């Protein structure tokens, strides 16, 4: 698969997003581009108020594009805002091209419950219902299906309750990590 990135965003993050729609794809710098070859072209632009990402995705000779704009709100880090803009653009282009909307939205990595917990804590600090606000953000900003957003907030709530009871010599157990797009040879999750 050919991947083109223009803008200040990590290549690995963009690859993990591409793997949502192209599972098992390899990314080669030397691969020649042809009209039939799978490709994603991503452009990220920024100004003082926002980040705007545009994704053009090609598969089987067909092509779709989408863009997403995320405001710099002074609350989230610029890195998180950039990632949301890029994720939303790639997700929408892929959803249109393939006709599917993956239930986990743009959540990648092995600890999405950590994000849900951070969102809930932030909402509670502002006087909101933490779980409800976290679910709203997960479905709205991160494009997760409502049932997956609810599951994440439940996992986050349970993690938070357990963390207080586990001593410093405790450990975490992960069961079926659906978020990580790769299975590295050294990974203990496999």
Model regions: which residues?
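Conserved, surface-exposed functional patches that form binding/active-site neighborhoods
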Residues: 82-102
